[in-house]
Structure formats: structure tokens, C-alpha cells
Amino acid sequence: MVVENRLEKEKPAVGMETTVFVHGLPRKEAIELFRKAKKISEEMGFQLAVVGVLKGKIILGMNEDELTIMMNEGSEKIGTREIPIALAKGMNAATTVSATIFLCKRFGIDVVVTGGTGGVHPGGVDISQDLTEMASSRIILVSSGIKSILDVDATFEMLETLEIPVVGFMTDEFPLFFSRKSGKKVKRVENVEEILRIYRTMEELKLEKTLMVLNPVPEEHEVPREEIEHLLENIELKVEGKDVTPYLLRKLVEITGGRTLKANLSLLEENVKLAGKIALALGR
């Protein structure tokens, strides 16, 4: 196994998946987001550890050129299950939330950031590896909830069944990616210090679960849940498996005239800031 860890040991770091850049956004916006996230990390004083696999090598702290190579040459979207296969076969692979959590935990990064996590898809057969990884890795994950295309009720119940702690940052509503409200209630935290107390308590208990910190999309960029659900009802699904989420997200961008893309970029930027604050506080 070849690993290139570019992180400074004593400096706080935030892990970030490569799938959001390579499969989740149009190329232009993906590169702009990467540059913004890097700038935020430099200004705040933490390290942005974009995690991916390039030609079978794990890289912690990917740069813009490497992301561009992955976009140009193509890269498979991988969860935890596929990591050993991608490494052994020398593949280019973009990590999802599950693979990112696994690799960050393996190499000492305590905070991971994403836009929206996976969950249970309608029908109940397709269940994301994100959930099972969160159920077995103690780490802090900052997100804007689960992706709006999922079965919300089933995913919410699965989070409880898998004993995954969930808190809302300055909200008691479980957000749904583009939408601030789901009708599902969560425990509210007011500040980063509360998040740290919960995480430290998890460490004391040796509770090997991910602390899911939910940061709703900024209000000015929200696309309400009802609108998203109505739009999804009219999209004909022409793919299956791992291609479902990127396909539906692209379709929503088209149908909404880019509103969901603006929401996605906005929430990702805010999540990077919150994750950075948490990482810096953890490092003190």
C-alpha cells in the first residue's frame, strides 16, 4: 500500500472527499470550490486534506492538478468496500463519505466535511456505505444532512438503529441538503464547544460512532423540500447503483435553472468553515 500524506503533524486538518469535486459538481464550479476551500483553510489556519486515490496511491492533501487529472482520465466512485480493490489495481478513485471517513480515521484526521451524506434510497434495498461506516468510526462529520433524493423516514430511522449521534448546529431541525427543514427533530447545539464536549464524552465512552454535525444550507439559497420532492417525482431514472445520486443531482440542476447548484456550493463553503472551527478547537 502506497500512501502520500502531505499533512503537517501538529497542524489541525479537515478531511474532504474527492467525489464532490469529480462526480458531484460541474468541472468549472468544482475547481472554483476547491480554490475557495483552500483559501478558507489558509486564512483560518487549518489544513484541507482532500482525500483520493491516484493510480493506486492514497493521497491525503490532493492538489488542483491531481483533481484535474482525475477529471480528465476518469475515476471510479468508491466507498470503503472498494478501497483495497482500487489500490491493488492501480486505479484512479474518488472517495465518497464512507471511504473518506475510513481513510481519515486510519491516518489520524478527526474532522471530515461534506455536503450531504448518503442513506437509504426509496425502496429500501439500496443503502449507502456512508451509514455503515459512520456506525463504526469515531470521527466528526460536518454536513447539511442527508441528500434530498433519499427516503428521509427510512434514513432517519437507520441513523437511530445504528446508534449514530446526530446534532444540529444552531438548529433543532434535521436538514435535507438543499432544504433547511425535514420535519424531523434533532438535539440542538449552540457552539463549537458543545460539539467538542459531546465528542470528548464519546471518546471517554469508547463509542466508535461518527458524530454527525448538521449545518443547514444558508436560508437565501434554500430550495424547499416540497419543491425538491415534486421535481424528483417527474425525473425518469435511467441509471442504477452508484450512478443514481450524481444523475439525479445533475437533473435537479437542469430543472431548477442552477438553483440547486448554488445551494450546493453555498452549503459546502459554510460547512468547510464550520469544520475548520471544530478542527482548530480540537487542536487547542
UniProtKB/Swiss-Prot annotation:
It holds the Pfam family Indigoidine_A. The keyword NAD does not apply. It comes from the Bacteria. One of its GO terms (cellular component) is cytoplasm. GO terms for biological process: nucleobase catabolic process. Keywords: Glycosidase, Hydrolase, Lyase, Manganese, Metal-binding. Substrate binds at residues 77, 97, 128-130. It catalyses: D-ribose 5-phosphate + uracil = psi-UMP + H2O. The active site is at residues 17, 147. One of its GO terms (molecular function) is hydrolase activity, acting on glycosyl bonds. Disulfide bonds: none annotated. It is an enzyme of class 4 (lyase). Its cofactor is Mn(2+). Binds 1 Mn(2+) ion per subunit. Mn(2+) binds at residue 126. InterPro entries: Indigdn_synthA-like, PsuG. Its EC number is 4.2.1.70. The keyword Manganese applies. Signal peptide: none annotated. Belongs to the pseudouridine-5'-phosphate glycosidase family. Homotrimer. Catalyzes the reversible cleavage of pseudouridine 5'-phosphate (PsiMP) to ribose 5-phosphate and uracil. Functions biologically in the cleavage direction, as part of a pseudouridine degradation pathway. This is Pseudouridine-5'-phosphate glycosidase. The gene is psuG.
